[in-house]
Amino acid sequence: MSAPDLKRAAAERAIPLVEDGMRLGIGTGSTAAAFIALLGERVRAGLTVTGVPTSEATRIACEREGIPLATLEELPELDLTIDGADEVDGNLRLIKGGGAALLREKIVAAASRRMVVIADASKRVETLGAFPLPVEVNLFGIGATTRAVEAAVAAAGCIGEIVRRLDKAGQPVLTDGGHALLDLRLGRIPDPEALSARLWAVPGVVEHGLFLGIADAAILAAAEGDQAVVSVLGRL
């Protein structure tokens, strides 16, 4: 069973959580894309929802599927957010931001009564950090900010390298908000809360990809033979 099949299986389990009339935060990334496609089918079948997208890419995908959209200014309180994750541990702590939408994703999730993660089971880890941790930073003073982030990482007991994210053409990636991304290749984050606090203390850091105390549940799809087996971490 392929990774896209598993992502679709996780998304299928999340679809029944969406009720008529909901105000829905809609995530970014390949698993969220599977959810958007299924949600579009439900909308065309008569489901009434209003979505708030977490990125321009998600906005375009939702519009293509005919999903009604609003901004967070228009709908400042959401019922549910469905989004993917790059890593999730047993305490529902996440690393997100591989799709460069971490700031908007965190704002939308924080505005929601509930956040449910959908992912294939390979994203489930014992300790966060194998996936590079994204840190969104202001372009002004990026050199000084990078040095301060390096010091924060060391003070939090982490070891690794920090690189600026580049696109496939070798150009620096900019977020939808016009900020740069640093990827922290740490391998292991022994104390995510400590690292989060250290990063927040750095002037120039706009947001980081540690989502702590935000997710309520994670739907994880694993392959067993040619079947997808879906498990739930937390409470749906």
Curated annotation (Swiss-Prot):
The active site is at E105 (proton acceptor). Substrate binds at T28, G29, S30, T31, D83, G84, A85, D86, K96, G97, G98, G99, K123. Pfam families: Rib_5-P_isom_A (PF06026). GO terms for molecular function: ribose-5-phosphate isomerase activity. It is an enzyme of class 5 (isomerase). GO terms for biological process: pentose-phosphate shunt, non-oxidative branch. Gene3D superfamilies: 3.30.70.260, 3.40.50.1360. Keywords: Isomerase. Its EC number is 5.3.1.6. The keyword Isomerase applies. Disulfide bonds: none annotated. It catalyses: aldehydo-D-ribose 5-phosphate = D-ribulose 5-phosphate. Pathway: Carbohydrate degradation; pentose phosphate pathway; D-ribose 5-phosphate from D-ribulose 5-phosphate (non-oxidative stage): step 1/1. It comes from the Bacteria. PANTHER family: RIBOSE-5-PHOSPHATE ISOMERASE 3, CHLOROPLASTIC-RELATED. Catalyzes the reversible conversion of ribose-5-phosphate to ribulose 5-phosphate. Homodimer. Belongs to the ribose 5-phosphate isomerase family. This is Ribose-5-phosphate isomerase A.
